[in-house]
């Protein structure tokens, strides 16, 4: 049995948009570049040709990677799943660092969607693992390389 990769609806949409761009814009553009470069003669020393072929290889590899991710993903719509007021995949969590009173808001997403600068954290991150299953006003102890950090869950959104 294949393990499905959890992915938010937004994450799947972004991958589909990228796939469409690669297939309908980039791939045809590269094909034209290769045809143009072939017109320049000897392919052994044709830098434009080799550059276009390399770009084609990267493009085709990315297309295969995205198609594989989408076919092996479990797309989860957070607005349609039961959560019982708990932190679950896809939820947005506002937490308070008990030690320094810093407040953070993160959304728990799939590995491929995570972007710490955008406050999107991977379901497999230590932070997510410590928050999953918790409810508002509970304390989550997050294990970090520099020691354990306590966070109070202030708010959970399912958007």
UniProtKB/Swiss-Prot annotation:
Keywords: Coiled coil, DNA-binding, Transcription, Transcription regulation. SUPFAM superfamilies: FKBP-like, GreA transcript cleavage protein, N-terminal domain. The keyword DNA-binding applies. One of its GO terms (biological process) is regulation of DNA-templated transcription elongation. InterPro entries: GreA/GreB_C_sf (IPR036953), TF_GreA/GreB_CS (IPR018151), Tscrpt_elong_fac_GreA (IPR006359), Tscrpt_elong_fac_GreA/B (IPR028624), Tscrpt_elong_fac_GreA/B_C (IPR001437), Tscrpt_elong_fac_GreA/B_fam (IPR023459), Tscrpt_elong_fac_GreA/B_N (IPR022691), Tscrpt_elong_fac_GreA/B_N_sf (IPR036805). Residues 7-72 form a coiled coil. Pfam families: GreA_GreB, GreA_GreB_N. It comes from the Bacteria. The keyword Transcription regulation applies. One of its GO terms (molecular function) is RNA polymerase binding. Belongs to the GreA/GreB family. Necessary for efficient RNA polymerase transcription elongation past template-encoded arresting sites. The arresting sites in DNA have the property of trapping a certain fraction of elongating RNA polymerases that pass through, resulting in locked ternary complexes. Cleavage of the nascent transcript by cleavage factors such as GreA or GreB allows the resumption of elongation from the new 3'terminus. GreA releases sequences of 2 to 3 nucleotides. This is Transcription elongation factor GreA. It comes from Buchnera aphidicola subsp. Schizaphis graminum (strain Sg). The gene is greA.
């Amino acid at each position: 049995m294949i393990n499905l990769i959890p992915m938010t609806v937004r994450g799947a949409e972004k991958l589909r948009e990228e796939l469409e761009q690669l297939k309908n814009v980039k791939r045809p553009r590269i094909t034209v570049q290769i045809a143009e470069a072939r017109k320049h003669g000897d392919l052994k020393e044709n830098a434009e040709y080799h550059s276009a072929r390399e770009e084609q290889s990267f493009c085709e590899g990315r297309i295969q990677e995205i198609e594989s991710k989408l076919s092996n993903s479990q797309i989860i719509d957070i607005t349609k799943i039961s959560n019982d007021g708990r932190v679950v995949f896809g939820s947005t969590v506002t937490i308070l660092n008990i030690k320094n009173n810093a407040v953070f808001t993160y959304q728990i997403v799939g590995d491929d969607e995570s972007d710490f600068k955008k406050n999107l954290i991977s379901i497999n991150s230590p932070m997510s693992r410590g928050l999953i299953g918790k409810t508002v006003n509970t304390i989550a102890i997050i294990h970090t390389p520099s020691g354990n950090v306590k966070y109070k869950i202030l708010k959970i959104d399912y958007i």
